[in-house]
Structures are given as structure tokens and as C-alpha cells.
């Protein structure tokens, strides 16, 4: 080997080896400090790509597990609302069973129907207001896809159905609808009439008031029997007193001499009393609200059928000398029953279609019966259990004020009782049960999906760890080796750097 000064080959070789051991030491320290075998693509290009795909799957599956838990929450929210709907349906069914019992009065049936209506409205409220994260879960049909995988198409569908009164087939559910009219139902109270028709029974004439718009003449109220009957055999009217030949005449108080008598009586009470005093007249207690002068003018009020009625007496001079029917004015449509003299009024039903006034079946026999009221001919069948008008079956309905009225089958269709109420409720319960069962099954499916996702994430983490995580035993060994090589290399480099000094010995 030539003895040279300019190039120290041994030193260069030692430096190169020292750099290699330095690189190994740096790599080992980096892996030990990060815990990763692959800290950059240069550490393992293929391994880095594989580990990165595992990371994508792990993150996607972890989020999918959270999505599945959200799916369980949606199903639980919906099922909870359906449970409350089910409770309301069970109560409606219980009430329907009660309503089908023949011992119920009209008042009982109305109370039952009122509660049923409230329960049905609550079902609609629950349907409309139940939501999860702003999504209404029962107000419309909807298929909600829940992503339960890390890739496209990996979903579970929650089938949400619209559940309300209409979708359950309970729209118009009624256990207290109008019933078919019978001859015995052809009656209404005096308070519903303003006009009259005239009927002949033998040589006698009977007037029965209906809403005909005819002017009621100022006639003295006659003495009448308690009831007027329609004979099922021939449709003729008769009274319960065969020898009574007095005409039946119903009248409005302010258009008759009876109204004059009432005006005088009320004016006299006002004249003899003071504001705030009370007095009784024909079974009704009146209060003097206003007294004008000393001639009997003023206002009195009372409560009839649950509403306040004010009667005004005006334009009286010189005592009660000029009192007549027109003197007494009412804030409501006040009528007087010619049977018992009691005051009645009804503001809502006075303009309804023609009604028979206080007619009652009596001794129904074979044969079809007919009666004409204000030009409308009502026909009762031979048994008296069905009444028709213009070929359409008539039904008895009750107004909001409790007055029985006649309506035809077209109007009754919208109000009629549900044909098979218990079957309708059972059908609704079955639909709710089916939806609840579906939601229960989907919750179990989500539970299974979450378990599987957890297992998959665990296995993928293990696989990724084997690729990119550092083996500390190996790396510590590599670091120790590199450290020793560094120490040795440094020492040898010092020796190599001294080799050129040997050339000086040749110059001595």
C-alpha cells in the first residue's frame, strides 16, 4: 500500500461505516420514541400503503358503530311513542266495549264518545310531535338508511310508517252516531219552531209549528192536550183525549196575547221592585238589572238552558196601560210552551230544517204511515222502525245544545257510528303491534351489527399493529448495536486519522 498524505483511505472507510451506524442509531431511536416501525413511506413503502388502508377501514367501522347506536336510539324513540299510542288504543277499545252495552243512556254514550275523541286526538298529537334530531318519525312513511359499514351500500333500513288516526282506519270513529229514526222519534221540543202547518183529524184541525217561516198570528194560546200523536196505520194526527176539539197552536211569546200578559207581569215586577231584586214568573227566576222610571220600563235577565237571556220592557207610559206583546223584547229567541207555560229558547237550532213538533208514536199497526210537514212527506214503514223522506232513510241526531233533529242518510253518513268498532280497534292495534315488532327486530339487528363491527375493528387494529408498530425488543437491540458501532467507529477513526503521520518517519 502506497504511503500517501493527500488521501487517507482508511479514514474515509471508517467515516463511511460510522455514518451507517449513525443512521441505524437514528432509525432505532425514532422507532423507539414513536412506537412505530413505519414513520414515513421510506421506512416501508408497501407496508405504509397497507396500514393506511387498514386505518381507513378502522375509522369507517368505528363511525359505523356509532351510526348503529343512533339507529337503536331512533327505533327506541319511535317504539316508545308507539307504546303510548297503544295505551290510548287500549283505552279506546275498553270504552268501545262499554259503549256497546245496551244499558247506556244518551248521556253515557256522549261521555264515552267525548273521551274516545280526546284519546284519538292524543294519538294524532303523539304522531305529529314525536321526532328524533328534528326528524318526525311517525308523521309520514319513511325509509331511513343507517350506514353500518365502511363502504358504499353497507346499510340497514329502518321502515318508519305513518301512524295516526287516519292511517289506523279510525278517522271518524264513533260509538254515538245518529240512529235510524222510528215513528216514536218524530218529535222535537217547542223551542225549535217559528211557523206551523195545519192537519185535519176528523172534523178537527190541528196546527203543528215547524220552521216554515210562516208568520204566527196574535192569537190567544189555546188549551191543548199533553201530547199529539201520529197514527202508524194512517198517518193521521190524534190527541190523547179523543173528545178534545181544541186546535193545537204553538206560538212565539212576542207575537201573541200571551206575550202581552207576560209583558204586563214583568213590567209590574219591575215597577214594584228595585235594581238587584229578584222575582219568579212561570217557574223562572228573574233579576231586575235596570229600572227606568216608575212606569215598569227596564231590563230583567235570567238563565235559560245555560245561557243568559235579557228581556227588555220599553215604551210604557202611565203605568201598564199600553203594554202589548211588542213591548216585551228579548235578547234571545224566547218561546213559551203552551203545555206547561215554561220559558225555553234555543238560538242555534231555530233555523234548522223542518222538524215535527212533539209528535209521538201511538198504537203502531200494520200499514205504511205518512205525515206531511211543511210540504215534506215523511213515511214510516209498517213496523214503525224506519222513517224515510224522499226515499232516503232518516236518522235522529243531536245538536250541540242536546236537541234531537232529523237528518237524512247522506248527512248521517259523516256522523254514523262505526259499524264494527271493536274490529276496527283490533285492526289498529294489530298495525301498531306490527310496526313495534319491526322496530324491536331492527334494534336486535343493530345490536348484532355493533358487536360484529367491534370485532372487526379489533382484528384490523391488530393487523395494522403488526405492520406499522415497532418491536421494542428488536429496536432496542438495533439501538445497542448502533451505539457500540458508533463508539468503535469513533475510536477507529481516530487511529485512521493518525496513519499519515507515518510518512514523516521517512523524512527524518
Curated annotation (Swiss-Prot):
The regions listed as transmembrane in this protein's record are none
Q: Which GO terms describe its molecular function?
A: structural molecule activity
What's in the misc comment field? Individual Salmonella serotypes usually alternate between the production of 2 antigenic forms of flagella, termed phase 1 and phase 2, each specified by separate structural genes.
Q: Which family does it belong to?
A: Belongs to the bacterial flagellin family.
List UniProt keywords, sorted A-Z.
Answer: Bacterial flagellum, Secreted
Q: Which gene carries the instructions for this protein? A: fliC
User: Can you say where in the cell this protein is located?
Assistant: Secreted; Bacterial flagellum
- Give a Gene Ontology cellular component term annotated to this protein: bacterial-type flagellum
The record, for InterPro entries, names:
Flagellin (IPR001492), Flagellin_C (IPR046358), Flagellin_C_sub2 (IPR042187), Flagellin_N (IPR001029)
| UniProt name for this protein | Flagellin
Which Pfam families does the record cross-reference, listed alphabetically?
Answer: Flagellin_C (PF00700), Flagellin_N (PF00669), FliC-like_3rd (PF22370)
Cited function = Flagellin is the subunit protein which polymerizes to form the filaments of bacterial flagella.
Amino acid at each position: 500500500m502506497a504511503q500517501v498524505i493527500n488521501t487517507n483511505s482508511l479514514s474515509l472507510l471508517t467515516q463511511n461505516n460510522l455514518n451507517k451506524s449513525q443512521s441505524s442509531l437514528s432509525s432505532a431511536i425514532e422507532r423507539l420514541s414513536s412506537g412505530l416501525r413505519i414513520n414515513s413511506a421510506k421506512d416501508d413503502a408497501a407496508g405504509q400503503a397497507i396500514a393506511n388502508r387498514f386505518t381507513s377501514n378502522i375509522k369507517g367501522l368505528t363511525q359505523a358503530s356509532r351510526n348503529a347506536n343512533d339507529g337503536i336510539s331512533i327505533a327506541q324513540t319511535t317504539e316508545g311513542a308507539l307504546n303510548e299510542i297503544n295505551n290510548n288504543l287500549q283505552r279506546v277499545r275498553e270504552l268501545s266495549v262499554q259503549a256497546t252495552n245496551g244499558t247506556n243512556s244518551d248521556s253515557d254514550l256522549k261521555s264515552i264518545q267525548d273521551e274516545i275523541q280526546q284519546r284519538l286526538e292524543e294519538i294524532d298529537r303523539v304522531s305529529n310531535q314525536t321526532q328524533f334530531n328534528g326528524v318526525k318519525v311517525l308523521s309520514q312513511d319513511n325509509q331511513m338508511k343507517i350506514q353500518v359499514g365502511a363502504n358504499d351500500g353497507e346499510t340497514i333500513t329502518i321502515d318508519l310508517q305513518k301512524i295516526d288516526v287516519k292511517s289506523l282506519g279510525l278517522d271518524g270513529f264513533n260509538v254515538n252516531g245518529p240512529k235510524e229514526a222510528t215513528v216514536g222519534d218524530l218529535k222535537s221540543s217547542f223551542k225549535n219552531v217559528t211557523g206551523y202547518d195545519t192537519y185535519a183529524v176528523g172534523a178537527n184541525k190541528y196546527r203543528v209549528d215547524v220552521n216554515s217561516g210562516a208568520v204566527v198570528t196574535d192569537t190567544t194560546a189555546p188549551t191543548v192536550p199533553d201530547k199529539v200523536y201520529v197514527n202508524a196505520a194512517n198517518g193521521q194526527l190524534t190527541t190523547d183525549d179523543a173528545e178534545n176539539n181544541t186546535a193545537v197552536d204553538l206560538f212565539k211569546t212576542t207575537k201573541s196575547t200571551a206575550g202581552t200578559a207576560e209583558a204586563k207581569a214583568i213590567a209590574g215586577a219591575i215597577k214594584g221592585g228595585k235594581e238587584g231584586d229578584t222575582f219568579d214568573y212561570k217557574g223562572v227566576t228573574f233579576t231586575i238589572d235596570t229600572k227606568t222610571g216608575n212606569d215598569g220600563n227596564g231590563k230583567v235577565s235570567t238563565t235559560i238552558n245555560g245561557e243568559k237571556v235579557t228581556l227588555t220592557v220599553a215604551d210604557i207610559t202611565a203605568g201598564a196601560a199600553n203594554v202589548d206583546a211588542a213591548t216585551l223584547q228579548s235578547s234571545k229567541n224566547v218561546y213559551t210552551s203552551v203545555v206547561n207555560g215554561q220559558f225555553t229558547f234555543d238560538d242555534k237550532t231555530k233555523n234548522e230544517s223542518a222538524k215535527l213538533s212533539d209528535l209521538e208514536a201511538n198504537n203502531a199497526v200494520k200499514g205504511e204511515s205518512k205525515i206531511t210537514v211543511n210540504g215534506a212527506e215523511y213515511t214510516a214503514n209498517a213496523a214503525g222502525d224506519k222513517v224515510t223522506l224522499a226515499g232516503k232513510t232518516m236518522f235522529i241526531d243531536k245538536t250541540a245544545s242536546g236537541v234531537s233533529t232529523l237528518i237524512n242518510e247522506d248527512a248521517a253518513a259523516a256522523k254514523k257510528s262505526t259499524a264494527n268498532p271493536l274490529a276496527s280497534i283490533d285492526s289498529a292495534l294489530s298495525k301498531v303491534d306490527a310496526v313495534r315488532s319491526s322496530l324491536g327486530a331492527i334494534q336486535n339487528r343493530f345490536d348484532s351489527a355493533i358487536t360484529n363491527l367491534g370485532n372487526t375493528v379489533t382484528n384490523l387494529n391488530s393487523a395494522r399493529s403488526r405492520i406499522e408498530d415497532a418491536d421494542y425488543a428488536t429496536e432496542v437491540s438495533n439501538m445497542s448495536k448502533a451505539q457500540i458501532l458508533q463508539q468503535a467507529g469513533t475510536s477507529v477513526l481516530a487511529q485512521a486519522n493518525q496513519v499519515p503521520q507515518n510518512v514523516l518517519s521517512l523524512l527524518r
